[in-house]
Amino acid sequence: MVAGHLREKKGYFYAVLNYTDAHGNRKTKWIATGLAVKGNKKRAEAFLQEQRRSFQEDVPITGDVLFADFMEQWLTVIKSSVAVTTFASYSNMVKKVIVPYFRERQIALQELSAKHIQDFYLKELERVSASSVIHYHANIHKALKYAVKLDLIASNPADKIERPKKERFMANFYDADEVNRLFEISKGTKLEIPILFGAFYGMRRSETLGMKWDAIDFERDTITIRHTLTTVALDGKRITVAEDRTKNKSSMRTLPLVPFVKERLLELKAEQEENRRLCGRSYVKDYTGYVCINEIGDIIKPNYVSCGFPKLLEEHGLRRVRYHDLRHSCASLLLANGVPMKQIQEWLGHSDFSTTANIYAHLEYSSKVISADAMLAGLGIGNRE
C-alpha cells in the first residue's frame, strides 16, 4: 500500500499519496476530499486510507488503447482537479454507461469515429432522456479533447456530432393553499425545516441540509446560503460531502429572515441544545453547528428528504410532487404576487437570467395581460371582455 498523509489547503483536506513509479521516480499525487477541515478529521482519514488501498499507478496511454480504457484513464487524470460531487457524477456515467457500451464493441481510441458516438447516443435515447445523453456527450467530448491535447488523435470526433435537443422543462408546483397545508402537516417532523427552507426560500436540497446556525443572524434577521451538504455514490460506496461552496457564485446569497421562520428556528435551536444535554456523550459531534440534524445530532440525510417527502404527502392526501418542486413553487408564488423575474433569479440563486426565464416564463401570465391591455389601448379598441 502506498504511503500517504492529509494536507490542509484553503480550508479543505487533501489526501496526498507518495509512490515510486516504474522508472524509479518519486511521485506525489494530490486528491481532493471535498471535506472542510473543521469537524471532518475522521472522515478525511477514512478517505485517505481508502485512496491508499485503491491506488493504482497511471499507465502510459497510446493511441491504440481501447476507447473504453481511455475513458477510465481520463477519470483518473481529472479526479484531483474537480469537486468530489462532480467527479462522482462523471464516474458513474463513464463506468456504468459509456465504458460498458464501447468495451463490448472493442473500438480503439484511434478508430473512434463520429458515427460510433452517434450510434451510441441513438441507442441511449431509446431508454433515457435527451438531457442524460447531453451529459454523456459532455464527458465524451472532454475526454476526447484531452486525447487531442496529448496528440493521441488528430481531431475530436465528438465535434461532428448532432447533439439531441434538450426538452423544455415544465416545472411542477404547489399553489398557496397547498404550500400552507404542507407547512401545517410537516410541523414537528424532521422534514419541517427542509420543507420550510425549500418552499419559502426556494433552497436546493443541498443548501437546505448544508445550512448552519452561524449562517443565520438573529440580530440582523438574515439567513445566508453559503454551505452545501450532499451524498454521492463513488466506487460502490455512498459518501457525505460537505462544502463551503454552492452550485455557482450566484447561489451564495443572503435573504431576509422573516418572523415566522425566525420563531421556529429559535425553538429548534433550543430543542437541539436540550437534546445535546440529555444525550451527553452519546450525542453525535460530527455535525455540530448544522440546522438539519436529528434528536441525537446526526445529519438528516439527503435520501431521507427525497424518500420521506413523498411519503408525507401520501399520508396526508396531498398531490405528489418532488422535494425540488418546492423551489419551483416558491418561484411561481413570487411571480403570482408581482415579483419581477430578475429578483426571482437573485432569490433562487440562478447563475444567469436566462435560466430563470426559461424555466418560469410560461407562468408569467400577468405580464401578458398587461401587454394585451396596452395593445388594446394603443389601438383604441377598448378593454378586454
What spans do the regions from the language model cover?
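Short N-terminal "domain-start" leader segments
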Residues: 1-10
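N-terminal DNA-binding module of tyrosine recombinases/phage integrases
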Residues: 9-12, 19-115, 268-287, 365
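N-terminal core-binding DNA-recognition domain of tyrosine site-specific recombinases/integrases
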Residues: 37-40, 75-152, 168, 299-304, ...
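Short functional hotspots where side chains directly engage DNA or cofactors
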Residues: 108, 159-160, 220-226, 322, ...
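Short, basic (Lys/Arg/His-rich) helix/loop patches that form interaction surfaces
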Residues: 127, 180, 184, 188-191, ...
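Basic, Lys/Arg- and aromatic-enriched nucleic-acid-binding interface segment
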Residues: 134, 149, 153-155, 159-213, ...
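DNA/chromatin major-groove-contacting recognition/catalytic segments
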Residues: 181, 185-187, 234-241, 337, ...
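C-terminal secondary-structure termini that scaffold catalytic or DNA-interacting sites
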Residues: 220, 231-252, 259-261, 267, ...
